[in-house]
Curated annotation (Swiss-Prot):
Gene Ontology terms: biological process: enamel mineralization; intracellular monoatomic cation homeostasis; magnesium ion homeostasis; magnesium ion transport; visual perception
InterPro entries named in the record: ACDP (IPR045095), CBS_dom (IPR000644), CBS_dom_sf (IPR046342), cNMP-bd_dom_sf (IPR018490), CNNM (IPR002550), Ion_transp-like_CBS (IPR044751), RmlC-like_jellyroll (IPR014710)
Modified residues annotated as Phosphoserine in this record: 657, 661, 766
Transmembrane segments: 176-196, 262-282, 291-313
Cytoplasmic face of the membrane: 197-237, 259-261, 314-771
Name listed for the protein in its UniProt record: Metal transporter CNNM4
Keyword Ion transport recorded: yes
Function, as annotated: Probable metal transporter. The interaction with the metal ion chaperone COX11 suggests that it may play a role in sensory neuron functions. May play a role in biomineralization and retinal function.
UniProt keyword tRNA processing present: no
Length: 771
């Protein structure tokens, strides 16, 4: 077999030129195929296809293969067939330059065994030649071979002279470790790569400031971990250099071991890349980013050991970084960043909304001024300095709900004093004391602040205890004339606290939910003291508003028959203001036992309830005629207000009298209970009338409340109508007229006209329950 262009090119064309030449020769040989012998094969060139070990092309374009490998060479030519493998062999040459000196194949080598030609193309223009390389001798590490061909089986061998026909066989690098140890070492290096990569992210992400916080307020396990990590984390650059050096060293060693284990080529690159990326980067960093504290604490010994091993290199580098870059900047949050961090992390922390609002309010304290939270001057409740502290003025003060009230003179902007409600504790409204007398006596200081005062400074002033109310003012220099202080409003400690907690504080006396929006409190148990003011046209007996208020509250709270569940407070007040309900009795010193001194007489019918307001009475009760004295706020005849029908037994007994007066603290209650137990003090019922079995006689001048049974029953019906109004029926007009004709009843109001049959049934049922 003659080599096509077998004379060779001593200067060695580039690969592209050689392939082009081979293609032209192939076309030429096909054109001349009619003149060639059908048995003659022509080889134009060869290239490396594959091998089972390390192989490839060196920079000079020469094929190199490993010893003891199977190599597949792709041959190009004409009329290639199975017999062509007998026409191909290799000869050993000294070097690549000597190939060009001769074309003789003096001695064929046995180190390369040509097997066969396979996968011949349909046109017999290419095929795959299988060559087996034997192992080199111990003293040899490489050999160079040249391709030899012959035109026929008995023809002479001709050596190719170009570099494309050369083949290097190199020594195979054996494993320097046993296979099991090699695999184990690769696994250990993968683990170390993951540890260093994870620690690099986990430890460096732990801020030293955060570690100090965890040491103080973390769980017991977190505190333990933080105490271990914090000393080495303070050496930030030294730790960083040590971890990076360890990571690079481990990854480099791992790549070399994988290359030696798998062999060079695409498989070695792919396996090392996949192993390092997945097991050395992704998994450990994903783990340490979530559990860096625990991983760093449990691997602290390994970290310290490697820091010690890399000390000669990593420590100088870290010092250089400290010098060039400066000390590590730690995470410090200012006020705005801290508030934003709390807002962003709200879904993940355990702070409730109220706690978050308090923290936010406290952080904003230094950014707000008193002008932002003050109550405008025109919205403030104030009192004139020349006011008289009578019942009307004091009731107005009580209804305002404020405990500190500014006192102004001439105009509201001229605040001269502060009145505390507690200053009025010993003031009797009947004395009509001038307000100036009280303010001059206590002389509370008036605290003024400027409108641009920050809330934190205002809070510090309030904490000093001087005052919990301050007058907000500013310097007004607008227009012509000298500047002057202009009062803008009031600010209190409550306003500052509300701004801190970001919520309104409502106590039992507040009338507004917000002093800026002036939104009123929706539901308040507000006491209207104006109803107790002096009305001479309603009361025949002169009684002070304070005593009327005390009697009203005593009946509503201490006497079950007048409790708000039975009789509304509004109806009770009307009842007390009705003519002849509040009466006076002048005591006759010359005739102590005259008939008019007796409010109740034993064994005589009575249809009224009596509450002593002022004075003393003597009560005689029981079979033993036990006598004792009582005073103000003792009451009698509760059973007379509702008497059981004749066909019904009396109700369960209730005490004949009770006293809420503090004037008799030394009353002998044992004697009272003994005397009451010894007699039938509850009276009896004869044909629907209440008959008292005790006597009550005046000992001094008396002022007392006397409510008849009919007045009480009318009050109950009016209360029911107020609570549940009923539609008007035809018969109600007649009932209202009869109700008006009774002289002892109070004036008929609009609810009385709504009485109907249903009210009558309710009235009878109420009488039975009361009895």
């Amino acid at each position: 077999m003659a080599p096509g262009g077998g004379g060779g090119r001593r200067d060695g064309w580039p690969a592209r030129g050689r392939l082009l030449l081979a293609a032209l020769l192939l076309l030429w040989t096909r054109a001349a195929s009619g003149q060639s012998s059908p048995q003659q094969s022509v080889i134009l060139g060869m290239r490396l296809a594959s091998c089972n070990k390390s192989c490839g092309m060196n920079p000079d374009g020469i094929i190199f293969v490993s010893e003891g490998s199977t190599v597949n060479l792709r041959l190009y030519g004409h009329s290639l067939g199975d017999i062509s493998s007998n026409l191909i062999s290799f000869t050993e040459v000294d070097d690549a330059e000597a190939v060009h000196n001769s074309t003789n194949c003096l001695e064929l080598t046995k180190d390369l065994v040509v097997q066969r030609l396979v996968n011949v193309s349909r046109g017999n223009t290419s095929g795959m030649l299988v060559v087996i390389t034997k192992f080199l001798r111990r003293s040899e590490n490489m050999k160079l071979y040249a391709l030899c061909t012959r035109p026929r089986a008995d023809g002479p061998w001709t050596r190719w002279t170009d570099k494309d026909s050369l083949l290097f066989m190199v020594e195979e690098h054996g494993r320097f470790l046993p296979l099991w140890l090699h695999i184990l070492l690769v696994m250990v290096l993968l683990v170390l790569s993951g540890i260093f990569s994870g620690l690099n992210l986990g430890l460096m992400a732990l801020d030293p400031m955060e570690l100090r916080i965890v040491q103080n307020c973390g769980t017991e396990k977190e505190r333990k971990y933080a105490r271990k990590i914090e000393p080495i984390r303070r050496k930030g650059n030294y730790l960083l250099c040590s971890l990076l050096l360890g990571n690079v060293l481990v990854n480099t060693s791992l790549t070399i071991l994988l290359d030696n284990l798998i062999g060079s080529g695409i498989m070695a690159v792919a396996s090392s890349t996949i192993g390092i990326v997945i097991f050395g980067e992704i998994l450990p960093q994903a783990l340490c980013s979530r559990h860096g504290l625990a991983v760093g604490a449990n691997t602290i010994v390994l970290t310290k050991v490697f820091m010690l091993l890399t000390f000669p290199l990593s420590f100088p580098i870290s010092k250089l970084l400290d010098f060039v870059l400066g000390q590590e900047i730690r995470t410090v949050y200012n006020r705005e960043k801290l508030m934003e961090m709390l807002k962003v992390t709200e879904p993940y922390n355990d702070l409730v909304k109220e706690e978050l609002n308090m923290i936010q309010g406290a952080l904003e304290l230094r950014t707000k001024t008193v002008e932002d939270i003050m109550t405008q001057l025109h919205d403030c409740f104030m009192i004139r300095s020349d006011a008289i502290l009578d019942f009307n003025t004091m009731s107005e003060i009580m209804e305002s709900g404020y405990t500190r009230i500014p006192v102004f003179e001439d105009e509201q902007s001229n605040i001269v004093d502060i009145l505390y409600v507690k200053d009025l504790a010993f003031v009797d409204p009947d004395d009509c004391t001038p307000l100036k007398t009280i303010t001059r006596f206590y002389n509370h200081p008036v605290h003024f602040v400027f409108h641009d005062t920050k809330l934190d400074a205002m809070l510090e002033e309030f904490k000093k205890g001087k005052s919990h109310l301050a007058i907000v003012q500013k310097v007004n220099n607008e227009g012509e004339g000298d500047p002057f202080y202009e009062v803008l409003g009031l600010v209190t400690l409550e306003d500052v606290i509300e701004e801190i907690i970001k919520s309104e504080i409502l106590d039992e006396s507040d009338m507004y939910t917000d002093n800026r929006t002036r939104k009123r409190v929706s539901v308040k148990n507000k006491r209207d003291f104006s109803a107790f003011k002096d009305t001479d046209n309603e009361l025949k007996v002169k009684i002070s508003p304070q005593l009327l208020l005390a009697a009203h509250r005593f009946l509503a709270t201490e006497v079950p028959q007048f409790s708000p569940s039975l009789m509304s407070e509004k109806i009770l007040l009307r009842l007390l203001k009705y003519p002849d309900v509040i009466q006076e009795l002048r005591f006759n010193e010359h005739n102590r036992y005259c008939v008019r001194h007796y409010l109740y007489t034993r064994n005589k019918p009575a249809d009224c309830f009596v509450l002593i307001l002022q004075g003393k009475v003597e009560v005689e009760a029981g079979k033993e005629n036990m006598k004792f004295e009582t005073g103000a706020f003792s009451y009698y005849g509760t059973m007379a207000l509702s008497v059981a029908p004749p066909d019904r037994s009396p109700a369960l007994p209730t005490p004949l009298s009770r006293s809420a007066s503090l004037s008799y603290p030394d009353r002998n209650t044992d004697l009272t209970s003994t005397s009451l137990a010894g007699s039938n003090q509850f009276g009896s019922c004869i044909l629907g009338q209440y008959v008292s079995d005790f006597s009550v006689r005046a000992l001094t001048d008396l002022q007392y409340i006397k409510i008849t049974r009919q007045q009480y029953q009318n009050g109950l019906m009016a209360s029911r109508m107020d609570n549940s109004p009923q539609p008007t029926f035809d018969g109600c007009a007649t009932c209202s007229e009869n109700f008006m004709e009774r002289p002892e009843l109070p004036p008929v109001d609009e609810t009385t006209t709504l009485l109907n049959e249903r009210n009558s049934l309710l009235h009878r049922a109420s009488e039975e329950e009361t009895i």
